[in-house]
């Protein structure tokens, strides 16, 4: 049934390469479910599928249900992007280049606020931590978090193709392969609200949702859910794009239309969020922003760097009281 | 595609079978077990390879990585390397950046303790046109133990290598494979490495098989790894050979400069003269020795190698001090007067060369070429140093470029560990290439251009060259800039 669904969606996308990739990832996910016990197959079963996964017919679903934070067209868009996502020189190049910086930021911040992290060995700073990556895409950040030793990592994404690609890619790496087998690394196809409704006992030391909230329809509700799954004293990391004139120039005009760094339609300026708004959302959930840091991209050298200017890309760290 | 997957699965099964075989058969060489899987294999324990190993072992973030360093020759101890009072024939000019790197990995003290380190703070460059040439002079050498300000240091290759390798032996996670070379790369396939969890492996000359997440090729200009992987590169052969030897210098009779503090060790000037056949350089060594590197055409090199010691020395002195020949240059003189190319009418004898006492080594030679590899990285493979870029030795920058590679690659590996990346991650290695390739190419092209400029004897080019040199010699900010570059400092800083 899953296979049928994918081939259907691929025909729609008219991308011959994609279908091959997906058959491959499909095949591999089957290998997982058969090689490990029923526990692992749970994650690729329909349990976590949202109502939105049968995408063709019910695109109006999102507007009628109040609990959904995601828009269907966003999910569709990222379903299309998944095949090229893991290509470090492809359409997601800026994101690939950003990843080492944001991982380092997360570790550095956790070192200050989490006693475990400060005592862990340098190369395994996240040992003993439960971490979730909400909107994990194809697992860029999730893989890093898993390699850094987190005892449990959950990668959550509403786009099914992303999850299949993420599982497939993890199998290229022996360490991650082991982590999937012993369930310290899990990929789930789900929205945050579905995840919370089904597993509401999950309490994470760190909740990461990087470059996600600008694709979410109801950011306030999204933050509400993030705060619900984090432990008291735990950390929430958000990175997104500010809603400023400069961000329109650089993230939409520059990145999508002039430099063609990312596909047109990746971002919608009206969905960008000001740090002030995020602060008020966090406040109402008893969370406090402890740090805000700007990130700046140089399209010529393809390198990111930290800055104090929050006008375009920024990262924030919040603590639940 | 499905077939491909099946194939991969089969391969995985095969490994399992191999593993199970281990328990019933005695031939365990081809099996994968924890013992022969390394994080990093460094091929080549020369200057660049052993610095790479030290750099990984000395960094708190990367010291947990399991490293194999493979060196084909026998490794000397530091004591062995200084047992002969006469310096080795292969000497290297290290710039300050490289010295900083040695300090940061804690080997500089070992190297210095051999007392075979010679700083230089003056460079004299001139040619055969009778022109005064160019004189770079940095501040006096101030050595207060920690900070030495010299333009660079001339040290024997084997002293530095043995100091580095003795340091390598102190790291518990670095394993040294001595007198072993790489026999094969075991069907290395880019596609398989990129899209499966299979790690590349090398078979050593003793049939031992090692697997690694990252294989670093630091095995020099004739890299075996590069040949095995059929990595394409471009370059050219200069049709030149460098003739090298060691000299003992006499004591200077410098009466004019009695007040100088370091009268005993006044051997701090590097001389280089561009002859029509190629550059000859005298590199000052510690304890009154010097190294000659004479690049010349193949015939002349052969002739120089066959001469007896005395005639050879005569040739060396001549080549440094002989006045420019005026036989064929009536036109040159006209041009010279017209453009005032040689305002002081110098012959070249004014260049003060220390007296040469005698030859203390055999003469050796090596062919000269320029070579550059387009891809510094393949999946889980990375080339550093001469393996990816080979230059003419006239600027003494080859090893220093390799050391800059080491610095960048170790910081990339450090970042990979910190940000939870596989150390063989393609994007991270690509970043290494992006940082180093422009720098290396810049230097390669500058040196190649210099070579073409100085081996050209046409009046136009000599005129231009000398005009340029006289400009250089008289504009001190520009000269300081060049001194900076030769010290390895970057002129343009973006940040």
Swiss-Prot record, chain A:
Role description: O-methyltransferase required for two non-consecutive steps during ubiquinone biosynthesis. Catalyzes the 2 O-methylation of 3,4-dihydroxy-5-(all-trans-polyprenyl)benzoic acid into 4-hydroxy-3-methoxy-5-(all-trans-polyprenyl)benzoic acid. Also catalyzes the last step of ubiquinone biosynthesis by mediating methylation of 3-demethylubiquinone into ubiquinone. Also able to mediate the methylation of 3-demethylubiquinol into ubiquinol.
Protein name per Swiss-Prot or TrEMBL: Ubiquinone biosynthesis O-methyltransferase, mitochondrial
Extra remark beyond the main annotation: This protein may be expected to contain an N-terminal transit peptide but none has been predicted.
Keyword flag Metal-binding: yes
NCBIfam families in the cross-refs: UbiG
Self-association state and partner proteins as the record states: Component of a multi-subunit COQ enzyme complex.
SUPFAM superfamilies to which the protein is assigned, alphabetical: S-adenosyl-L-methionine-dependent methyltransferases (SSF53335)
Any GO MF annotation of the entry: 3-demethylubiquinone 3-O-methyltransferase activity
Protein family according to the UniProt entry: Belongs to the class I-like SAM-binding methyltransferase superfamily. UbiG/COQ3 family.
Database matches in Gene3D superfamilies: Vaccinia Virus protein VP39
Catalytic activity: a 3,4-dihydroxy-5-(all-trans-polyprenyl)benzoate + S-adenosyl-L-methionine = a 4-hydroxy-3-methoxy-5-(all-trans-polyprenyl)benzoate + S-adenosyl-L-homocysteine + H(+); a 3-demethylubiquinone + S-adenosyl-L-methionine = a ubiquinone + S-adenosyl-L-homocysteine; a 3-demethylubiquinol + S-adenosyl-L-methionine = a ubiquinol + S-adenosyl-L-homocysteine + H(+)
Lineage of source species: Eukaryota, Amoebozoa, Evosea, Eumycetozoa, Dictyostelia
Catalytic EC class: transferase
Single GO biological process annotation from the record: methylation
HAMAP family cross-referenced by the UniProt entry: UbiG
Positions that bind S-adenosyl-L-methionine: 102, 135, 157, 210
EC identifiers of the protein: 2.1.1.64, 2.1.1.-, 2.1.1.114
Subcellular location, record wording: Mitochondrion inner membrane
One annotated Gene Ontology cellular component of this protein: extrinsic component of mitochondrial inner membrane
Main location: mitochondrion
Membrane topology field: Peripheral membrane protein
Keywords: Magnesium, Membrane, Metal-binding, Methyltransferase, Mitochondrion, Mitochondrion inner membrane, S-adenosyl-L-methionine, Transferase, Ubiquinone biosynthesis
Curated annotation (Swiss-Prot), chain B:
Alphabetized Pfam families for the sequence: FAD_binding_3
One GO term (biological process): ubiquinone biosynthetic process
Pathway: Cofactor biosynthesis; ubiquinone biosynthesis
A single cellular component GO annotation: extrinsic component of mitochondrial inner membrane
InterPro entries associated with the record: FAD-bd, FAD/NAD-bd_sf, UbiH/COQ6, UbiH/COQ6_monooxygenase, UbQ_mOase_COQ6
Main location: mitochondrion
Reactions the enzyme catalyzes: a 4-hydroxy-3-(all-trans-polyprenyl)benzoate + 2 reduced [2Fe-2S]-[ferredoxin] + O2 + 2 H(+) = a 3,4-dihydroxy-5-(all-trans-polyprenyl)benzoate + 2 oxidized [2Fe-2S]-[ferredoxin] + H2O; a 2-methoxy-6-(all-trans-polyprenyl)phenol + 2 reduced [2Fe-2S]-[ferredoxin] + O2 + 2 H(+) = a 2-methoxy-6-(all-trans-polyprenyl)benzene-1,4-diol + 2 oxidized [2Fe-2S]-[ferredoxin] + H2O
Quaternary state and interactors: Component of a multi-subunit COQ enzyme complex.
HAMAP family xrefs: COQ6_monooxygenase
Protein name (database record): Ubiquinone biosynthesis monooxygenase COQ6, mitochondrial
Species this chain originates from: Dictyostelium discoideum
Gene field: coq6
């Amino acid at each position: 049934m899953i296979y049928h669904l994918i081939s259907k969606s691929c025909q729609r996308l008219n991308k011959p390469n994609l279908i091959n990739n997906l058959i491959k990832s499909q095949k591999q996910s089957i290998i997982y479910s058969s090689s490990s016990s029923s526990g692992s197959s749970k994650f690729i079963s329909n349990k976590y599928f949202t109502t939105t996964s049968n995408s063709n017919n019910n695109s109006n679903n999102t507007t009628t249900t109040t609990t959904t934070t995601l828009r269907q067209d966003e999910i569709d868009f990222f379903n299309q992007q998944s095949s090229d996502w893991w290509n470090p020189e492809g359409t997601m190049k800026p994101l690939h280049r950003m990843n080492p910086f944001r991982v380092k930021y997360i570790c550095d911040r956790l070192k200050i606020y989490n006693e475990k992290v400060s005592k862990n060995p340098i190369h395994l700073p996240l040992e003993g931590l439960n971490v979730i990556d909400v909107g994990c895409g194809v697992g860029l950040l999730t893989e890093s978090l898993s390699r850094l030793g987190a005892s449990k990592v959950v990668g959550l994404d509403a786009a099914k193709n992303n999850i299949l690609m993420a599982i497939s890619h993890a199998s290229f790496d022996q360490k991650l392969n082991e982590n999937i087998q012993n369930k310290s690394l899990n990929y789930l196809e789900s929205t945050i609200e579905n995840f919370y409704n089904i597993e509401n006992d999950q309490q994470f030391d760190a909740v990461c949702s990087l470059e996600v909230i600008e694709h979410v329809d109801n950011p306030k509700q999204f933050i509400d859910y993030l705060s619900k799954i984090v432990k008291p004293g735990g950390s929430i990391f958000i990175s997104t794009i500010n809603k400023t004139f400069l961000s329109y120039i650089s993230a939409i005009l520059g990145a999508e239309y002039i430099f063609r760094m990312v596909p047109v339609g990746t971002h919608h300026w009206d969905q960008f969020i000001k740090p002030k708004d995020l602060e008020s959302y966090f406040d109402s959930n008893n969370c406090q922003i402890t740090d805000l840091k700007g990130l700046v991209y140089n399209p010529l050298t393809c390198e990111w760097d930290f800055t104090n200017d929050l006008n375009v890309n920024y990262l924030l760290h919040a603590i639940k009281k | 595609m499905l077939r491909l997957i099946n194939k991969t699965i089969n391969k995985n099964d095969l490994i399992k079978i191999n593993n199970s075989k281990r328990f019933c058969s005695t031939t365990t060489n081809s099996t994968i077990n924890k013992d022969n899987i390394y994080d990093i294999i460094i091929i080549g324990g020369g200057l660049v390879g052993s610095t790479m190993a030290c750099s990984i072992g000395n960094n708190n973030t990367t010291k947990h990585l399991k490293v194999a360093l493979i060196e084909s020759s026998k490794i000397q101890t530091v004591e062995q390397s200084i047992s002969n009072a006469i310096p080795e024939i292969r000497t290297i000019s290290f710039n300050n950046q490289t010295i900083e790197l040695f300090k940061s990995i804690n080997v500089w003290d070992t190297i210095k303790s051999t007392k075979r380190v010679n700083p230089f703070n003056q460079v004299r460059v001139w040619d055969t046109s009778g022109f005064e040439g160019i004189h770079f002079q940095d501040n006096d050498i101030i050595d207060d133990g920690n900070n030495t300000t010299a333009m660079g240091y001339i040290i024997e290759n084997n002293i530095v290598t043995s100091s580095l390798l003795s340091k390598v032996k102190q790291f518990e996670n670095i394993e040294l494979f001595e007198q072993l070379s790489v026999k094969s790369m075991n069907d290395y396939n880019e596609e398989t490495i990129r899209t499966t969890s299979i790690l590349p492996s090398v078979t050593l000359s003793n049939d031992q098989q090692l697997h690694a997440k990252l294989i670093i090729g630091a095995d020099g200009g004739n890299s075996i790894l590069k040949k095995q992987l059929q990595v394409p590169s471009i370059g050219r052969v200069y049709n030149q050979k460098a003739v090298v030897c060691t000299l003992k210098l006499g004591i200077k009779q410098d009466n004019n400069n009695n007040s100088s503090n370091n009268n005993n060790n006044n051997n701090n000037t590097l001389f280089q003269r561009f002859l029509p056949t190629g550059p000859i350089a005298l590199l000052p060594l510690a304890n009154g020795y010097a190294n000659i590197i004479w690049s010349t055409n193949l015939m002349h090199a052969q002739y120089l190698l066959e001469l007896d010691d005395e005639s050879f020395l005569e040739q060396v002195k001549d080549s440094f001090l002989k006045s420019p020949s005026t036989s064929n240059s009536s036109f040159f003189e006209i041009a010279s007067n017209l453009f005032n190319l040689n305002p002081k009418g110098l012959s070249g004898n004014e260049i003060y060369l220390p007296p040469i006492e005698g030859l203390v080594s055999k003469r050796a030679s090596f062919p000269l070429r320029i070579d550059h590899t387009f891809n510094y990285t393949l999946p889980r493979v990375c080339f550093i140093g001469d393996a990816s870029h080979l230059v003419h030795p006239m600027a003494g920058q080859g090893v220093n470029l390799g050391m800059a590679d080491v610095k960048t690659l170790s910081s990339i590996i450090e970042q990979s560990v910190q940000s939870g990346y596989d150390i063989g991650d393609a994007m991270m290695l690509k970043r290494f290439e992006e940082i180093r390739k422009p720098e290396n190419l810049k230097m390669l092209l500058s040196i190649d251009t210099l070579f073409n400029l100085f081996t050209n004897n046409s009046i136009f080019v000599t005129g231009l060259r000398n005009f340029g040199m006289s400009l250089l010699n008289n504009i001190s900010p520009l000269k300081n800039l060049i001194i900076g570059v030769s010290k390895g400092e970057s002129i343009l800083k973006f940040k």
